[in-house]
Amino acid sequence: MDASRCGDPIRVLLVEDHSGFRLVLRALLEADERLIVVGDVGSADEACAHPMLEHVDVALVDVGLPGTSGIEATKRLRELNPDLRVLIMSGSGFDRASDEALSAGADQYLEKGALHHDLIEAIVQAGERGRTTSAR
């Protein structure tokens, strides 16, 4: 079921330490009516403490966060919200970190240079899978 058809946009939390890139991502995602960005933060600690975390469908997390890595953030976020879908982003392509991210509970590993359509579709698909799983 398409979330936009039932009137409930997929709620996204952006976790990216580069504020300029975070603003661009937010604008890109908010341009799609199927998505709503409920927050954007620059660290794993901010993400884990976000007041809307229990209502987030998908977290889009940078692998290279300062302090706590995106991989460790994935583990913590999934512990705090087991229904959360986590998509890890990296600017360095697919490497050992992709395996680590998936092992940590990430649903998908994406390159930051991915076409915006591919990024949005990955978020929508992850959000819809999460809603299907949590409804059971």
Please place each PLM-identified region on the residue numbering:
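Conserved acidic carboxylate
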Residues: E16
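Acidic, metal-coordinating helix/loop segments flanking the phosphotransfer/catalytic sites
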Residues: D40-V58
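Acidic catalytic/metal-coordinating carboxylates
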Residues: S43, S69-E72
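The short loop immediately C-terminal to the conserved phospho-acceptor aspartate in CheY-like receiver
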Residues: V63-G64
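Short amphipathic alpha-helix used as the core "switch/output" element in two-component signaling
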Residues: I71-D83
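Alpha4 helix (beta4-alpha4-beta5 surface) of REC/receiver domains from two-component response regulators
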Residues: E72, G93-L110, A114, E121
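C-terminal output helix
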Residues: R96, A114-G127, R131, A135
